[in-house]
Amino acid sequence: MSYTLDISCEIGRKNRPAVIICPGGGYEFVSERESEPVALRFAAMGIHAFVLNYSVIQKPFPTALLELAQATAFVRANAESWDIDPQKISVCGFSAGGHLAASLGVHWDKKFIRDTLEFKDEHKPNSMILSYPVITSGKYKHEGSIQNIVGLQPKPTPLDLVSLENHVSSNTPRTFIWHCCDDNVVPVENTILFIQALSKNKISFECSIYPHGGHGISLCDDTTSSKPSQYNEKCSQWFINAVKWLKSPDK
């Protein structure tokens, strides 16, 4: 699904940023609460938005990753006609969708992607926005997400490949990431492991860790809240902070 802004004769061409949104759902389904409402909010801020309905259960790694790589390359290939800055194409993921977005961030330069898709670097995201992401297949893993992406009896290689903190490199794009301390679904240690790896590799990042909020709170307001616990005014600041960060010069 795409939520692109029309080129206006009054405004003129703007060469706007774009985000490709990967909703969460534990690699079992694609969350509606982290799809269209988020895309519309980005569009309201002058950012083109796309939602990727990626393959989930019974479609093991790297199926969804290859789909995101193709989507990123497709958006970049159409950047001129859609009034998109080809150097400002970001991936934005929530929970398991955060794992998918971060997977492209750390694996975009790997041989298995380039050889399969015959890409050079047109699929590289320029930055990542990660919301309460699944990151590790180790001690702090989200069991359901990892099982759905690699199976119940995974081979060592794919199990290592989906533990993303081990694959951050100097080629990983800059990152905005946030999480809640009291997340009892995807432990906050997932984010901590990732920012430690980013710091070790000298990758620019901005991180917010909120004391309360739990998991799966999306925009944290009436737009996406299905129950009172998903409304959190303090955590809702993540979005405006992410937009400011996204529009700031790369560092």
What are the roles of these predicted feature ranges?
Residues N184-L193:
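Conserved alpha/beta-hydrolase "acid-adjacent" motif
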Residues I192-K251:
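C-terminal catalytic histidine-bearing segment of alpha/beta-hydrolase fold enzymes
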Residues N171, I177-H179, D183:
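Short beta-strand/loop motif that positions the catalytic acidic residue
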Residues Y3, E118, L152-H167, T172-P173:
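Active-site nucleophile elbow and catalytic-triad environment of alpha/beta-hydrolase enzymes
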Residues N15-G24:
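Short beta-strand element of the alpha/beta-hydrolase
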Residues Q70-E143, K155, L159:
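Primarily recognizes the serine-hydrolase "nucleophile elbow" in alpha/beta-hydrolase
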Residues E32-F50:
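Short amphipathic alpha-helix adjacent to the substrate-entry channel of hydrolases
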Residues V30-E32, L52-P86, N232-K234:
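Catalytic nucleophile-loop/oxyanion-hole region of alpha/beta-hydrolase
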